[in-house]
Every structure is written in structure tokens, then in C-alpha cells.
């Protein structure tokens, strides 16, 4: 035990009740998947960036041993529970709940370069919108998903892939009345806990079955075991209904979606491992929360807040990557000059400007990047960047809710589009089109849209995908688009089931 570190802790303990201590390790021979598998009894989330072509793919995070949760069934009241599930406090909003936790914990700030060093991690379901906008609750919330669920973890593993460095951050929690000897004992126990976690995390990786190669024939039969919440003919009729609303001037666009359910025996971690291989994305995540598993590979940021600067990166327009540099450039040029893609993208940039404008200081909203080609491992998109500086009386959570949900999964204007979708879609969306997010003690937020996401619950995996309906949409093509968007996750589920059937279970 370092005397200097102990002295620093004792000094901090005079001012703070929750004190982070951090140890750094070289991460040249371990990686996030291995660490999560080794800590599977206590780990509750894994956040990764798994696209080497993406500028966002630098950090990954693993949360261990949650000690507080923020939960809400409808978004109108949040319960703050301890690690035993006992309600400690209640709050009427997410912001009030987070601020109550901050006051109770009295956390010492941590000077560290990583964008997230501790705080709340979890999700807001799409149906949370009914608590903050004039959007009626859906008539059929059949999955009974919480509107919001966040965890605060005692220990956090933060990978910096650029530096090949791992930071292990452990939060010591004091009650405020400990004696000097008790504080020293608590600090020693924390040092031992860090050493034990580091040793466990770095164990050799358990033997894992080889992943099967992608099979085009299997891809063709993907949906044979999947059931939809929509009959095809009803979906086609609802596309026409949206077009009628567009013709009447209610909306410019609405994103109609369908949900697929697939029976599963394999665990969510097996599905996640396959998904990260076949569909790497800037935002990848795996959660185990309250009896459900969440697996996702989202390409799209919802909003990011760093040093009170908010950023939204609208994405619209997609092409596959070329098989050669020449084809890649040809496809990029085709995408950039496609008038329909450009029109949709401009609409989403306007939505982002409006969302940030609701919380930013006057005159600070800018579009430093407009309609550039962003290339990822498998696809390319039209990407813009909208930024603004938060007004002085705005909390970062206000910015998160101003952007929620994204226009790319709802429509424009957003509120009217969502009202129409609640009327037409046969079941509540649950997590789909909501947000996966972290909210740092330092006021930082990063979040992605909950698309390309599966919820595993009660023996079924649920995957939902939507298509943006506009005035000239062809119903049959929109039906196909929803299936195409769901195909990577359905394929990952099918492959995990094949391994399970062979008895080749993936550890975790």
C-alpha cells in the first residue's frame, strides 16, 4: 500500500463521501470481451466501439458491481434503489433522480482523459417519450419494458484502444462518520479489491468455439423462425396511411417499424459475440439488467455532451463499401449526389439544429460538417455535425431529452410523427428507437440510438426495424427495408442457436 496514495485518500475523505481510486495497466494482451467474460458474475454492461474505420472507436467500458439503480416504469417517477433492491429515494424526473444521487454520493472529481470515468449507464425506452411530450401511451405495451433503467457501478474498466491502456476505476463509498482507523481499513480493502479484479480480469481467455463462416444460403432463409408483430398486408396498408398523413400536411416523414421475435436458447453474450464480428459498429453494447439481456450494434449517435458542448451527428443515406478502391469511390460519389438521400439528410440536419437550439446559448448553434461521406467497415453514410454550447441553466440531461428520440427513428415534425406511429403500430416499441447512454458524474453524456438492437427476455429475442416513409414511398420496398435492417441481428441469433444446438456454448 502506497503511503502517498493513502494520505491523498484521507485528505479527500475530509471533503467527499465517494472517492475514486484508479490504477492503470498495459492492455496489449487483453481486450474487453475477455475481461467481461472473466468477470461475468459481477459485470452488468459492456460498451464497445468496434469499427476501426470510425473516428469514434477509441474507448470501451465495462461496469462491475452495481450499487445503485435508477428505474422508472413509465418515465413519470424514478425509483433510486440500492444493491439489494431497496428503494432509497424517489424523484419525479431523470434529472432530479441523477442530481439526488450526486448529492447523496458527494463524488470527488477524477482528472482523467477518458470520456467516461463513472456515473449512470443504461437506457431510455422509446415509450419514455410519453412522459415528456404530448404523445399518448401505446395501447399494447406487451413486453413490459421499463421506460428507463440506469446503474451506477462500484468499479469501471475503461479501455483506451489508441494507447493500448486499461484504467481500473474503483469508487470507495464512505458514510461520513468513520474514524481514522476505519478509513484506513476501508482503503486497504479497496486496494485488495482492485488487485483481485485486475487478477481476475487478466486470466487467460476461456476456450471458445469457432464462429461459423457467413453462409448466403442460411441468410436467404433467415426469417423462417421469426414472427412479426405485423401481418404483411397490414404493414403495406399502414405505409399508405402514413402517405395520406403526408399528403394532408401532418408530417413530412414518419418511420414505420415492425418487430420480429425469435425463440432462443443461447445466451445474449453468444449473440453479441457473433454480432460484433459480422456487423461491427461505433456503438456496440451488451447489458444484463433486471432479468433481460440487451445486445446492440448501433451506427448512430443520439447526442454527446462534453464540457457543456452538445453534438449531434445526423446520419442519413447509405451505401455498402466497394470491393475495390475504385468501386468505393464510385459508390461514394453516387451516394453524395443522390437527390433523395440529400433531401432526407437536410431534413435531419434541420431537426438536429432545432433539438440543440432548444438547449443551447443563442448564436452558438453551428454546422461545422455538412453532408460529408463517412466510411465505416461495411457501409458508408452521409454524415453531418451539429454543435452548440449549453445555456447556463441547462443540465446535460436536458440536452439528452431535447434530442430524444432521434428524428431518424420517429419522423418530422417529431411529435406529430410519433402520435401517428402510436396510432398505427400494433405494439409499443419498448427499447427500440430509444437511447443507450452514459451520464457521467462530470456532466459528460454519450448516447446512441437503440437500433440494430435485440432484447432477450423470457426465451425470445425481439428485434425491431423501421423504414422512413415519405410521399413517394413504395410499400413493398419499405417492407423489405425493415427486413434488411433486421437481418444482421436475426442472423447473429440464428448462428448462436446453431452453436447452442451443438453444445458449443459461448462462455458468459
UniProtKB/Swiss-Prot annotation:
EC number: 4.1.3.27
Superkingdom of source: Bacteria
Binding residues annotated for chorismate, in chain numbering: 317-318, 432, 452, 466-468
Binding-site residues for L-tryptophan, renumbered to this chain: 49, 282-284
InterPro entries found in the cross-reference section: ADC_synthase, Anth_synth_I-like, Anth_synth_I_N, Anth_synth_I_PabB, Chorismate_C
Record entry for activity regulation: Feedback inhibited by tryptophan.
Record keywords, A-Z: Amino-acid biosynthesis, Aromatic amino acid biosynthesis, Lyase, Magnesium, Metal-binding, Tryptophan biosynthesis
Pfam family of the protein (one): Chorismate_bind
Cofactors required: Mg(2+)
Coiled coil start-end: none
Catalytic activity: chorismate + L-glutamine = anthranilate + pyruvate + L-glutamate + H(+)
Pathway: Amino-acid biosynthesis; L-tryptophan biosynthesis; L-tryptophan from chorismate: step 1/5
Quaternary structure (record): Heterotetramer consisting of two non-identical subunits: a beta subunit (TrpG) and a large alpha subunit (TrpE).
NCBIfam families reported in the protein's UniProt record: trpE_most
Protein name: Anthranilate synthase component 1
Lineage: Bacteria, Bacillati, Bacillota, Bacilli, Bacillales
Amino acid at each position: 500500500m502506497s503511503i502517498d496514495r493513502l494520505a491523498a485518500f484521507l485528505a479527500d475523505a475530509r471533503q467527499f463521501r465517494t472517492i475514486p481510486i484508479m490504477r492503470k495497466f498495459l492492455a496489449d494482451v487483453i481486450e474487453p470481451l475477455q475481461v467481461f467474460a472473466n468477470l461475468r458474475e459481477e459485470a452488468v454492461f459492456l460498451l464497445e466501439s468496434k469499427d476501426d474505420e470510425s473516428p469514434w472507436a477509441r474507448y470501451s467500458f465495462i461496469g462491475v458491481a452495481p450499487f445503485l439503480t435508477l428505474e422508472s416504469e413509465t418515465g413519470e417517477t424514478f425509483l433510486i434503489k440500492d444493491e439489494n433492491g431497496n428503494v432509497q429515494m424517489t424523484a419525479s424526473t431523470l434529472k432530479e433522480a441523477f442530481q439526488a444521487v450526486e448529492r447523496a454520493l458527494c463524488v470527488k472529481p477524477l482528472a482523467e482523459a477518458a470520456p467516461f470515468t463513472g456515473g449512470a449507464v443504461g437506457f431510455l425506452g422509446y415509450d419514455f417519450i410519453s412522459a415528456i411530450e404530448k404523445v399518448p401511451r401505446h395501447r399494447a405495451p406487451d413486453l413490459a419494458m421499463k421506460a428507463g433503467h440506469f446503474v451506477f457501478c462500484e468499479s469501471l474498466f475503461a479501455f483506451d484502444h489508441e494507447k493500448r491502456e486499461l484504467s481500473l476505476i474503483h469508487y470507495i463509498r464512505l458514510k461520513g462518520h468513520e474514524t481514522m482507523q476505519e478509513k484506513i481499513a476501508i482503503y486497504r480493502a479497496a486496494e485488495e479489491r482492485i488487485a483481485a479484479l485486475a487478477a481476475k480480469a487478466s486470466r487467460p481467455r476461456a476456450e471458445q468455439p469457432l464462429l461459423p463462416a457467413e453462409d448466403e444460403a442460411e441468410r436467404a432463409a433467415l426469417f423462417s423462425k421469426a414472427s412479426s408483430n405485423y401481418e404483411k398486408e397490414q404493414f403495406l396498408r399502414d405505409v399508405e396511411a402514413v402517405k395520406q398523413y403526408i399528403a394532408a400536411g401532418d408530417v413530412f416523414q414518419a418511420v414505420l417499424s415492425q418487430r420480429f421475435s425469435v425463440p432462443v436458447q443461447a445466451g445474449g453474450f453468444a449473440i453479441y459475440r457473433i454480432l460484433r464480428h459480422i456487423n461491427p459498429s461505433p456503438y456496440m453494447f451488451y447489458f444484463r439488467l433486471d432479468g433481460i439481456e440487451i445486445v446492440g450494434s448501433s451506427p448512430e449517435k443520439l447526442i454527446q455532451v462534453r464540457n457543456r458542448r452538445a453534438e449531434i451527428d445526423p446520419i442519413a443515406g447509405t451505401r455498402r463499401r466497394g470491393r475495390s478502391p475504385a468501386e468505393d469511390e464510385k459508390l461514394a460519389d453516387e451516394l453524395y449526389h443522390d437527390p433523395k438521400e440529400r433531401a432526407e439528410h437536410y431534413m435531419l440536419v434541420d431537426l438536429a439544429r432545432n433539438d440543440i437550439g432548444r438547449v443551447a446559448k443563442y448564436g452558438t448553434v453551428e454546422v461545422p460538417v455538412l453532408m460529408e461521406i463517412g466510411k465505416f467497415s461495411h457501409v458508408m453514410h452521409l454524415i453531418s455535425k451539429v454543435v452548440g454550447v449549453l445555456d447556463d441553466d441547462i443540465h446535460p440531461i436536458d440536452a439528452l431529452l431535447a434530442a430524444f428520440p432521434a428524428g431518424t427513428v420517429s419522423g418530422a415534425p417529431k411529435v406529430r410523427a410519433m402520435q401517428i406511429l402510436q396510432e398505427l403500430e400494433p405494439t409499443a416499441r419498448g427499447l427500440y428507437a430509444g437511447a443507450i447512454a452514459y451520464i457521467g458524474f462530470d456532466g459528460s453524456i454519450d448516447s446512441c440510438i437503440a437500433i440494430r438492437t435485440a432484447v432477450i427476455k423470457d426465451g425470445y429475442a425481439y428485434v425491431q426495424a423501421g423504414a422512413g416513409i415519405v410521399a413517394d414511398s413504395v410499400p413493398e420496398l419499405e417492407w423489405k427495408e425493415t427486413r434488411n435492417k433486421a437481418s444482421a441481428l436475426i442472423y447473429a441469433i440464428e448462428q448462436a442457436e446453431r452453436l447452442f444446438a451443438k453444445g458449443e456454448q459461448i462462455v458468459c
